[in-house]
């Protein structure tokens, strides 16, 4: 679906603007009535990031709503335990 692909790319851009090491996966869009669209996804948070998960959620959701006021983010945060070399 073109709309899902476009919106996923926009959300990926938002996440990368916060920290280039962050990634998202399992992205879905589900309409919730006429005035709301849930953006449901997982975000991988790198170790040592200066933001709490609540702060990250606020930043991501605020920027998503600027793209489209009907967007409502539902984010599951995963910790990234991989070791950078």
Predicted feature locations:
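Alpha-helical transmembrane segments and adjacent TM-loop junctions that form the membrane-embedded core
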Residues: 1-85
